[in-house]
Amino acid sequence: MKKLTYFIHDGKDNYEPLYEYTISNVGIDEFYARQLCTYFIIKGSQYELISNEMDGDDEILVLEDRGRNNSVLDEKSYRGLGIHVEFRRCKESENYKLLTAVPCRTHLDVIRYLLKDIIDVPGFGQMAVTSTEVDEDRGVYVLYVKTIGENDMG
């Protein structure tokens, strides 16, 4: 792997490059962590992963634009503070309430969370993951969760 490139698909078979990382700038563990996220937030916009592809030594993530990313009251920036994972409620009606955030030593620690359907949320116990994102604007990974068996609509 040499580079990871995000492309935006416009729905008409056109693909525009959005952002690129090289292996010399980020580690391979971060390459993998990013590929496991359902959503990508950058420059105030939200993108949804629709395809994860391999092209020789290159990793390609194809995204669809979901419009402006709506900020919530308890968001904070983790830039310069190391690697962090936030756990938030999946319900818009609850303003995607922050449950807790944990620091991670490496992206391998993040990958452990991203691979799971059920996770232990510190202080809340086991919860079901509904989606994952990397928020480039705030420098944090976010896992949206619900109580096991709970409907995630709303």
Residue spans for each PLM region:
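Short beta-strand-centered aromatic/proline hotspots
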Residues: 45-56, 125-136
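Surface-exposed beta-loop interaction hotspot
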Residues: 52-105
